[in-house]
Curated annotation (Swiss-Prot):
Segments of skewed composition (Low complexity): 138-151, 1098-1108
Organism whose genome encodes this protein: Mus musculus
Basic and acidic residues bias spans: 1007-1022, 1219-1229, 1348-1360
Compositional bias (Polar residues): 1233-1244
Localization annotation: Cytoplasm; Cell membrane
UniProt protein name: Capping protein, Arp2/3 and myosin-I linker protein 3
Residue ranges with Pro residues bias: 981-997, 1078-1097, 1272-1281
Family, per entry: Belongs to the CARMIL family.
Domain of life: Eukaryota
Organism placement in taxonomy: Eukaryota, Metazoa, Chordata, Craniata, Vertebrata
Region (Disordered): 124-151, 864-901, 969-1375
Length: 1375
């Protein structure tokens, strides 16, 4: 503060300071103010930063008048001590005590004006009134200026404070602090009104007004903030005054319709305007404004570099004026680089757009062009761009437009020519544009011919390409090498992705792929598509770096893709948003993150994830050190926070902490990567190696005594291969350990240590030079202070301590930070090298072992063929069966190994090993299918056996080189497939020869034909949901309990008159009647007619049966084991012709154990053993049953097959007889038991088979070549007599139990499902009187279909089962 005049008392000065407490008083002078002409009064002049105050000489002090420095229009010095100040409100004349006081006041006013207005300010004249001097320039750039160096950011804070004082408003110190601190620290020359949007409109207006006099800021930015009229007026004022504002952004600022007209006028007023970027998007602007603006743009000498008029409601008329301006002003052709006219519907739909097309067709400098949503014709626009925009255009957005040419016609040549000629294009957006198929083909063809582009982003989302577009992409995309990012979202591809995804994988330049909203398919097809996608990203040469399936609603099936991320090494970014995968998907993602080391970014939201799912992710990130970014799942986090706020907050903080940790350089756990890769490399091939080595060792032992020299050479080579195979197990860990040991003191670490030492020396030398230079400069500027400091020896010693950098810091920065990053990358490369070497060696060993195995197996087969004596075991076999016997060993080698051992199969197994298996929660998984089939009474092994039979075949071509040339009968591989029923039997010249189906690795026949016969006859309605099926539901009897009232009421439904059908075979362990089944009675001792057959000769070295003990223990009743009766039908003929017999009939068969529970009733069923072999039969019966077998060979096929003749009409009972159902069934069961011991005629045999087919539809008679044994002829039963309801029929001599026991003769050997006690089964047989001269058919109650459907289930539920067996049994074959 300047020294106050001596005439002023201390009390007055303090009173003035107290009065001006808001501002510091810089000067106080006692002056004489001219109140009237030539009349002066004493006053006190007080000067503050921006204002001059006049006080009377009174205490307490009060302000008499004041004015701001900005109100000064002229400041004149009339004499040595008199000044004249002209203000907006009048003139002030005053005399100061001395000339020194005049100079002080003059310098203060000049300095204040220079701070507010850096340019030439007001004029200050000095001299007498008669002889005035010339003007004195007090601007800061002039020599006479007394202003000091400007403050930060061009003095914005001072200008803002002066304007606040001028307008009488309070100065916001926060504005000054933000500008002086934040803007200055960032060197930011963009004044953003959003930073101060919390203030009032008048405060914003003052800030904008301050920019008019500021030369630091060059850009005024405001977006999505509605500006008031006061602010907009100051914007126009700033543009009219500023000479440094280059860019104006008023995006969605609420501009009035006349603002552009005023803006055009401002451009005309300010000749020094340097504005070159104008952004007025998202403001309603009328055509008047555009017309005025176009006229002013004609006068811009340098043109505009950026013009954005998106969504401004501009009409084609305004666009025409703008286009004419572009063409008339040549400066725009070289200056305009950014043009945005998007979101103006109909703008380019008329002929007024030709003016803009003409400008685009001329050579120009456009780099960014956005015409999305303007209804322009894409083909016409590309024709204009072809001539003028090929050299500089990098961004082209033509979304939400259309093409002018019609569908079916050829695309204009501009499509292909433009995309083949453009040089710098990097982004093309054609989303929501209906591209005809021809235009899409032309686009892809043009890109395929362009050799200048690379990493192009092509957006074809929402183009409704569908199947035709998918086909075009498959055909053309493989030849396009410039596309680095492809967006195909929401195109309705759906099932076409099955073929499109593999085609996308063939393009190795593709790095980023977007496939969201294309999965609107059924569950089965969706799983196939996801498996194709998994196969794509698991390829070793996959080029994808990011994959997006956002908003696809994959739900739980997202886990199919997630399971492949664990071992994936190519993807660095994945987007799983909008799929609703819930917590179980988050759990699968956590498992993938635990072992993944390539993902850097994960985007996921809208997946219905709760706090529990986020907890799984947090736990996974504890062991993941490579994931850097995870998008904030706003939707899921907010939903989880509502239910569990504390847990959600803790879990998300934990996730963020892990991500922050991963963004710093650190040591990656290489041991985890080693163990993971070791498991993927070794476990997939180790099992195959073990099995191959075991097989080759057996063959070597079998051929070790062979004297042939070639065989011995091969044996020696095989032994060497086995040694290599054993050593290969230690190859992967040995190579990894070797690389780890050599890397500890390798050249990289040594070089880093030497570099650290050299850097430390260089740092010390540089600091020494800097210190000396600073000290010398300080001596020049402040020599006295330096001499004093050196005398005290303080400064240099303190500086010397500060200018040293610790050596351990430099060493840690190089070795622990940069060196650690280098070491991590080096470890990854070493691991990939070890993996490649191990894979290559193991593949070679597998190939050589397999070839050696095939060669030794061929030698072994030839030796066995030569050693078989003529007329031996193979005597009596047909040529086809002998050929199969000779080729048996060679055929089973691959299948027993599980797959063909070739490169394709090995790679497939490794890829499958890298993918996590499907979880049980996904519907359609094998586990769920097993449980569903088990609930329906189908054995659990059925589905797994079917799946195994379908997947064991490999895509191998090895077998093509080993086709037999002689001695074997060639058969087509599809000959064994099930076929639909034939309406006519085959002719005599074309006998039906059974063909054995393909085998699985355990020797069993495949189950591909399971369910085929039931498929052609099954009804649409499912009857399993209304009532449970038991064995009693097949035929009602007298012993059933009465139905409860609720069940009786349910039976009155609409569909309960229909007759239920049984499943194939008996129920599984979960059936209600599984515990009621009892084992059959022991068969009688063997007789001469059925001698026991010897064990079949093995075809290999101690070959085991067709199934293992575990599989044998899982056999189910009615299925002949887990393979079912189809296996028995396929294998029966081959076993019989090979001379294989069944186990001795005199041996009682023990109950099988399934799942730890003994299942009774698993004895030999209907003449079939568990080995799939028919009991011995008499050849005399073959001729009489040959025709019957031909008719019955396709009974399972369906409705078109042969049926037994219906009973005569006279045998059908009347309605009164229908009411005696229980007695009739009881007699029918006794008659059927007695009749089973009789000699069957063709008609009766057909009847038995028809009865058996209902309960056991798969248990059919073997193939035509099987021979039947004639059973012993016994007495026929008497004709049944109808018994009234409620009475018991008269007992036949011999009893029912004896009759049923006699049916277990070797000839019949029919399965039983008895409910009686064990004592009933041990009773001796009895004979009853029979009629020898009468042939009777199996007795059935002849009832109408409606009566059968109404009564068949009711007796079954009336009475509980009798454990004593008194109430009789139900024969399964009576249906």
């Amino acid at each position: 503060m300047a020294k106050a005049s001596v005439e002023l008392t201390r009390e007055l000065q303090d009173s003035i300071r107290r009065c001006l407490s808001q501002g510091a008083v810089l000067q106080q002078h006692r002056v004489k103010l001219e109140t009237k002409p030539k009349k002066f009064e004493d006053r006190v002049l007080a000067l503050t930063s921006w204002r001059l105050h006049l006080f009377p000489l009174k205490v307490p002090a009060k302000v008499e008048s004041s004015f701001n420095v900005l109100e000064i229009r002229a400041f004149n010095t009339l004499s040595q001590n008199q000044i004249l100040v002209e203000t907006e409100r009048g003139t002030v004349s005053m005399r100061l005590p001395s000339a020194e006081s005049v100079d002080q006041v003059t310098r203060h006013v000049s300095s204040a004006l220079s701070k507010v207005c850096p340019g030439p300010g007001c004029l200050i004249r000095r001299g007498n009134a008669d002889t005035p001097e010339g003007p004195r320039d007090t601007s800061p750039n002039s020599e006479t200026s007394t202003s000091t160096t400007h403050s930060v950011c061009g003095g914005f804070s001072e200008t803002y404070a002066a304007l606040c004082d001028y307008n009488g408003l309070h100065c916001r110190e926060e504005v000054q602090w933000d500008v002086d601190t934040i803007y200055h620290a960032e060197d930011n020359r963009e004044f953003n009104l959003l930073d101060f949007s919390h203030l009032e409109s008048r405060d914003l207006a003052l800030m904008v007004a301050a920019l008019a006099y500021n030369q630091w800021f060059t850009k005024l930015y405001c977006k999505d903030l509605r500006l008031g009229s006061e602010v907009l007026e100051q914007v126009l004022h700033t543009l009219s005054k500023s000479g440094s504002l280059e860019e104006l952004v008023l995006d969605n600022a609420g501009l009035k319709t006349d603002f552009v007209q005023k803006l055009a006028g401002v451009f005309g007023e300010n000749g020094s305007c340097v504005l070159h970027a104008l952004i007025l998007s998202h403001n309603p602007i009328e055509d008047k404004g555009f017309l005025s603006l176009s006229q002013q743009l004609l006068c811009f000498p340098t043109g505009l570099t950026k013009l954005c008029l998106a969504k401004t409601a501009i009409s084609p008329r305004g666009l025409q004026a703008l286009g004419q301006t572009f063409g008339a002003n040549p400066a725009f052709a070289s200056s305009l680089r950014y043009l945005d006219l998007s979101k103006n519907p109909g703008l380019l739909a008329t002929d007024e757009a030709n003016a803009l097309y003409s400008f685009l067709a001329q050579p120009n400098a456009l780099v960014h062009l956005d015409l999305s949503g303007t209804d322009c014709a894409v083909d016409m626009l590309l024709g204009a761009l072809l001539h003028g925009c090929c050299s500089h255009l990098t961004y082209l957005n033509l979304a939400r437009n259309s093409c002018s040419h019609r569908k079916g016609r050829e695309a204009p040549p501009a499509f292909k020519q433009f995309f083949s000629s453009v040089y710098t294009l990097s982004h093309v957006n054609l989303s929501a544009t209906r591209l005809p198929l021809e235009a899409l083909r032309a686009l892809l063809q043009g890109l395929s011919l362009n050799s200048h582009l690379s990493d192009l982003h092509l957006d074809l989302s929402s183009c409704e390409l569908r199947s035709a577009g998918a086909q075009a992409l498959q055909e053309q995309l493989g030849a396009v090498t410039c596309i680095g990012s492809l967006d195909l979202s929401d195109n309705g591809f759906d099932s076409d992705l099955l073929t499109l995804v593999p085609a996308l994988g063939k393009n190795k330049s593709l790095k980023h792929l977007f496939l969201g909203k294309n999965f609107n398919v059924k569950a089965k097809t969706l799983e196939e598509i996801l498996h194709k996608l998994v196969q794509l990203i698991q390829e070793e040469d996959c080029s994808l770096q990011s994959l997006s399936v956002a908003d696809s609603r994959l739900k739980l099936r997202t886990s199919i893709l997630i399971n492949a991320l664990g071992s994936n090494t190519c993807l660095a970014k994945v987007d799983l948003s909008g799929n609703g995968m819930e917590d179980i998907g988050a759990k699968m993602l956590s498992k993938a993150l635990q072992i993944n080391s390539s993902l850097r970014t994960i985007l996921w939201d809208r997946n219905n994830t709760s706090a529990l799912g986020f907890l799984d992710i947090a736990r996974a990130l504890e062991s993941n050190h490579t994931l850097r970014f995870m998008s904030f799942p706003v939707s899921d986090i907010s939903q989880a926070y509502r239910s569990a706020p504390e847990r959600t907050e803790d879990v998300w903080q934990k996730i963020q902490w892990c991500l922050v940790r991963n963004n710093h350089s650190q040591t990656c756990p290489q041991e985890q990567a080693f163990r993971l890769q070791q498991g993927l490399v070794t476990s997939s091939a180790e099992q195959m190696l073990q099995r191959l080595c075991g097989r080759v060792q057996e063959e070597v032992r079998a051929l070790r005594l062979c004297p042939l020299e070639p065989v011995q050479d091969e044996l020696l080579y095989a032994r060497d291969l086995i040694k290599d195979a054993k050593n290969s197990r230690a190859l992967f860990p040995s190579l990894y350990e070797l690389g780890h040991v050599l890397a500890n003191d390798g050249p990289v670490r040594q070089r880093l240590e030497s570099v650290a030492s050299e850097v430390s020396k260089a740092v010390d030398k540089e600091l020494q030079v800097i210190l000396e230079s600073m000290v010398s400069l300080t001596q020049e500027l402040c020599p006295v202070a330096m001499r004093v400091a050196e005398g005290h020896n303080k400064m240099l010693s303190n500086v010397a301590e500060r200018v040293t950098v610790p050596r351990n810091f430099i060493r840690g920065a190089l070795l622990e930070q940069a060196g650690q990053d280098i070491q991590n990358k080096l470890d990854e490369v070493k691991l990939s090298v070890v993996t490649y070497l191990t894979n290559s060696i193991v593949d070679e060993i597998l190939q050589e072992l397999y070839h050696s195995h095939k060669s030794l197996a061929r030698h072994l087969t030839q030796l066995r063929t030569l050693s078989d004596p003529p007329g031996g075991a193979s005597q009596g076999q047909d040529p086809s069966s002998r050929g199969r016997g000779r080729n048996h060993d060679h055929e089973e080698t691959d299948d027993e190994l599980g797959t063909n051992i070739d490169t394709m199969a090995i790679k497939k197994q490794k890829r499958c090993r890298k993918i996590r298996p499907v979880s049980a929660f996904i519907s359609g998984s094998p586990q769920d299918m097993e449980s569903q089939l088990g609930s329906l009474g189908i054995p659990p092994g059925w589905f797994s056996g079917l799946g195994a039979s379908q997947t064991t075949a490999s895509g191998s071509w090895e077998g093509l080189s080993e086709l037999p040339t002689h001695g074997y009968k060639l058969r087509h591989q599809t000959q064994g497939r099930p076929r639909p029923p034939r309406t006519t039997p085959p002719g005599p010249g074309r006998p039906s020869v059974p063909v054995p189906g393909p085998r699985q690795e355990n020797g069993m026949a495949t189950r591909l034909d399971e369910g085929l016969e039931d498929f052609f006859s099954r009804r649409v309605m499912d009857e399993s949901s209304s009532y449970p099926r038991t064995l009693r539901t097949m035929r009602p009897g007298l012993s059933e309990p009465p139905l409860p009232p609720l069940q009786k009421k349910r039976r009155r439904g609409l569909f309960h008159f229909r007759r239920p059908r049984s499943f194939k075979g008996d129920r599984g362990p979960g059936s209600p009647t599984a515990g009621l089944l009892l084992p059959p009675p022991p068969p009688p001792p063997p007789t001469q007619e059925s001698p026991p057959s010897p064990d079949p000769p093995s075809l290999g070295n101690n070959s085991s049966p067709c199934w293992s003990p575990e599989e044998e223990s899982s056999l189910l009743p009615g299925f002949g084991g887990a393979r079912g009766s189809s296996f028995c039908r396929k294998m029966g003929t081959e076993r019989l012709e090979a001379g294989e017999g069944a186990p001795a009939p005199g041996t009682a068969q023990q109950p099988r154990v399934h799942g730890g529970v003994a299942l009774p009733g698993l004895g030999r069923t209907k003449g079939w053993s568990f080995d799939g072999k028919r009991e011995g039969t008499d050849p005399d019966q073959e001729d009489s049953t040959q025709a019957w077998q031909k008719r019955r060979s396709s009974d399972d096929a369906g409705p078109g097959a042969w049926k037994p003749p219906p009973p005569p009409q006279s045998s059908k009972p009347s309605f009164s007889a229908m009411r005696r159902a229980e007695a009739t069934w009881h007699i029918a069961e006794e008659s059927a038991a007695n009749h089973s011991c009789q000699s069957p005629s063709p008609a009766s045999q057909d009847g038995d088979e028809e009865k058996q087919g209902a309960l056991f539809p798969e248990r059919m008679v073997p193939t035509r070549n099987a021979k039947l044994q004639e059973p012993p002829i016994g007495p026929r039963p008497p004709k049944p007599v109808a018994v009234p309801r409620g009475r018991r029929a008269p007992q036949v001599p011999g009893g029912r139990e004896e009759t049923e026991s006699s049916s277990a003769a070797p000839g019949a050997n029919k399965p039983r499902l008895r409910l009686g006690s064990q004592q009933d089964q041990e009773e001796p047989e009895g004979q009853g009187p029979t009629d020898q001269g009468r042939r009777t058919a199996p007795l059935k109650p002849k009832r109408t279909r409606r009566a059968q459907s109404c009564d068949k289930l009711e007796p079954d539920r009336r009475q509980p089962p009798d454990p004593t067996g008194v109430c009789g049994t139900s024969e399964p074959g009576t249906d």
